[in-house]
């Protein structure tokens, strides 16, 4: 529980959803069961399971899942004795049909995610989730790309629709600690609901940003074991827990067990070590959606251009989640320019 706070700090473990990007959406049912079981035994509060781009994301554009996400959600629910299973839903990708399916299977929390300036498209989904009896949070993605005033305006919309919390979502891993501080502080002063923070580690400040968010009043935070998440991953859960414990925050999650999950359960699944490589670093620097990395690397190979140039150009164009088709367009344009030089 947070020191001197009326509300506990709760963590959502996102390695089985955000980490799906790294796994190219190829999680097996047994992998989900094994990781969920050990996370639950460690005392994790929420475990998010779905396609990397949320419910309904298994498409040619976003990447086809190996196993139907509903089977993975059902497997996670089956393994949880105390943790709650969460799902992500992006309106326009997922629908209330998939949301109802997930709720019937046993998912208890949904985070309804929109671009930071498009909260108005979340109304139906937030309201429907409340009708289903689910916990529901708003998830304002690419939070670095809007002013603090715009962020507050959009968060208030989500609050008015019935969201029980609103997250500052640093999808690009572009925010610095002082920018997190001013955003969380502004929301804390403007809303009557909980505030959350979801970070990415592309600039190596995800843990620092999360600590800053908590200091400013955020009570819902995200982490990914062994940094298994898009780009350079999220705040590394086991590291975050160790830091919070040193600071006097008691979350009732077993730190040793979380270390074991990371080393024995998740590390063997990683296609490559999760570290800040040039692609993820450029995403944080340019402010590009973290799940674009693998798409950009594939496009770079196909068109014989530098993935960094693709990402920088995408940042200049201020592309948002859902515009993955722009990656190929940019790569083709760069290849044409290269041939003309």
Swiss-Prot record:
Residues 9-259 form the Pyruvate carboxyltransferase domain. Its EC number is 4.1.3.39. SUPFAM superfamilies: Aldolase, post-HMGL domain-like. PROSITE patterns: PYR_CT. It holds the Pfam family HMGL-like. It catalyses: (S)-4-hydroxy-2-oxopentanoate = acetaldehyde + pyruvate. The keyword Coiled coil does not apply. The keyword Phosphoprotein does not apply. The active site is at 21 (proton acceptor). One of its GO terms (biological process) is catabolic process. It comes from the Bacteria. InterPro entries: 2-IPM_HCS-like, 4OH_2_O-val_aldolase, Aldolase_TIM, DmpG_comm, DRE_TIM_HOA, PYR_CT. HAMAP family: HOA. This is 4-hydroxy-2-oxovalerate aldolase. The lineage of its organism: Bacteria, Bacillati, Bacillota, Bacilli, Bacillales.
């Amino acid at each position: 529980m947070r020191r001197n706070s009326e509300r506990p700090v709760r963590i959502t473990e996102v390695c089985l959803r955000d980490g799906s990007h790294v796994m190219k959406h190829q999680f097996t049912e047994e992998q989900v069961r094994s990781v969920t079981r050990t996370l639950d035994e460690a005392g994790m509060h929420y475990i998010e399971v779905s396609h990397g781009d949320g419910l309904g994301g298994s498409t040619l554009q976003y990447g086809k899942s190996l196993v139907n996400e509903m089977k993975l959600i059902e497997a996670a629910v089956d393994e949880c004795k105390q943790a709650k299973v969460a799902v992500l839903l992006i309106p326009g990708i997922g629908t209330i049909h998939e949301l109802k399916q997930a709720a019937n299977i046993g998912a208890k929390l949904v985070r309804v995610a929109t671009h930071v300036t498009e909260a108005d498209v979340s109304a139906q989904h937030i309201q429907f989730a409340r009708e289903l009896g689910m916990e529901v949070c708003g998830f304002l993605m690419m939070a670095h790309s809007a002013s603090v005033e715009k962020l507050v305006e959009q968060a208030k919309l989500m609050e008015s629709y019935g969201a029980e919390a609103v997250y500052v979502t640093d999808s690009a891993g572009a925010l610095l600690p002082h920018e997190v501080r001013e955003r969380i502080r502004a929301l804390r002063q403007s809303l009557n609901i909980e505030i959350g923070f979801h970070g990415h580690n592309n600039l190596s400040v995800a843990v620092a940003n999360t600590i800053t968010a908590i200091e400013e009043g955020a009570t819902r935070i995200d982490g990914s074991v062994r940094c298994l998440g898009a780009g350079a991953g999220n705040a590394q859960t086991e590291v975050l827990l160790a830091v919070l414990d040193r600071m006097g925050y008691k979350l009732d999650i077993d730190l040793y067990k979380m270390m074991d999950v990371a080393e024995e359960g998740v590390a063997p699944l990683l296609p490559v070590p999760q570290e800040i490589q040039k692609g993820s670093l450029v995403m944080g620097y340019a402010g590009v959606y973290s799940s674009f990395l693998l798409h950009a690397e594939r496009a770079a190979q196909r068109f014989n251009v530098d993935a960094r140039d693709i990402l920088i150009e995408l940042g200049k164009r201020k592309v948002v989640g859902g515009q993955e088709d722009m990656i190929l367009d940019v790569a083709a344009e760069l290849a044409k320019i290269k041939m003309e030089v």
